[in-house]
Amino acid sequence: MSLFKYAFSTLLLLFCFTTLKAQTLNPDKSYEFACVGFYNLENLFDTIVDPDTNKILQEDFTPKSSKQWDSKKYYGKLDNMAEVISKIGVSKSVPQGAAVLGVCEIENKSVLDDLVAHEKLQDKNYQIVHYDSPDKRGIDVGFLYQPKYFTVTSSKSFTLKLPDNPNWATRDQLLVTGELNGQKMHFIVCHWPSRRGGQKESSYKRVAAGELAKSIVDSLTKEDPLAKVLVMGDLNDDPVDPSVRETMNSVGEIENMVTGDMFNPMESLFKLGIGTLGYKGAWNLFDQMVLTPSFISLDNSFSTYSYFTAKVFNNSFLKNSSGKFEGFPFRTYSYGKFINGYSDHFPVYLYLVKQK
C-alpha cells in the first residue's frame, strides 16, 4: 500500500489555523493523499565564486565578503533548510511529506546536490530538476521530487524577456511534466521579479511574468483541456494584485470560478491576514500555488487527484521569538548580522486527494 493511503480518520490532523477550508470528504470512504510544496530558500549560496559567471550576489557569499560566508555558515544553512523541508506537509496521512517541492533563490545545482544529500533528507531520496537562469543576482529556481511517488517525463526552462529592455534578465520559469502516482501533472516553478524600485513602478515586470506563466498553462490546456497544471512560486505580489488575479485569471473561491479561471487557494488565506513574509510590520503572501480547474472535484467524487486544502508552514521554530520582528520569519541575516535563521519566507504547501 502507498504511504499516501490512509483511512479517513487521520484527516483531522490536516486542520490548523493556517489551513484553508478543505473540500468535503465522505467519512464512509477512504482516500489517498499527496503533498505539493514550495519554499524560498533565501539565498542558498555556496562559498565558491564561479570565474565563468558575472553574478551580482555571489561575491557577497564568500569568506572575505562582509557576510563572512564560510563553510560553517553554508553547512549550517543546509542543515536549517533540510530540517524545514523534512517537515513540510508531514502528517499521519502523508508521512513522507512533500512528494514534489519547488524551490527558489538557489545559486546552482551544486547547492541542491548538497541539500538533498543531507542526512535529514536522505530517506526522501529527492531528485533534482534544474536549469541555470540568466538572472543577474545569480539565483535560480529548482524542482525536487521523490521518485517513489513522482516520475519526471519532461522538463523545460522558459526565459522571461522584456521587449523594451533586452539587457534585463530575471529567473527562468521551470516546467516539469510527470506522473504523480501514475497520474499526469504539470508543475511550473516561478520566482517573479522583485518590487525593487517600487511596487507600482516595477509591477509591469510581474505582469509580464504572469503572462509568461499563463501562456505556458494555456499551451498545455489547449493540447489537453483537462490538463492538471499547478503554478507555484514566489510571485513577489499578493494573491489580489493584478499580476496574479487579472493576468493569471485567478479566483480565490471555487464557487466563483467561471470558464477560463484558475483557482488560487492562497487568496482566502491572505484575506484572513495570513502571510509568508513580512514587510514594514505587515504580512504579504507572495508564495502561492495556482491551479487549473481540473484539480477541482465539483461533485466531491475525487476520482482523480484533486485539491483538498492549502497551508502556510509557519511552525514556531521558523519565527522570530521576540523583538521588533516577533512572529515574522526567522531569517539568515538581519540588517547584515548573521543570526543563523532559516529564511525570510515561510514555505507553503497543499494536499491533493483522490478516492481509493
Which positions does each model-derived feature cover?
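Bacterial Sec-dependent N-terminal signal peptides
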Residues: 1-25
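Metal-dependent phosphoester-hydrolase catalytic domains
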Residues: 22-28, 219-229, 237-356
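N-terminal, active-site-proximal structural segment of metallo-dependent hydrolase catalytic domains
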Residues: 22-118, 129-135, 139-141, 318-326, ...
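Active-site-proximal beta-strand/loop segments in catalytic clefts of secreted hydrolases
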Residues: 39-42, 104-106, 130-134, 146-147, ...
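Extracytoplasmic/secreted cell-surface and envelope-processing proteins
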Residues: 46-48, 110-113, 137-140, 196-199, ...
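Sec-exported extracytoplasmic/periplasmic mature domains
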Residues: 86-90, 108-121, 149, 215-225, ...
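Structured beta-strand-rich core segments of catalytic domains in phosphoester-bond hydrolases
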Residues: 100, 106-192
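Extracytoplasmic, non-cytosolic globular domains
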Residues: 130, 174-269
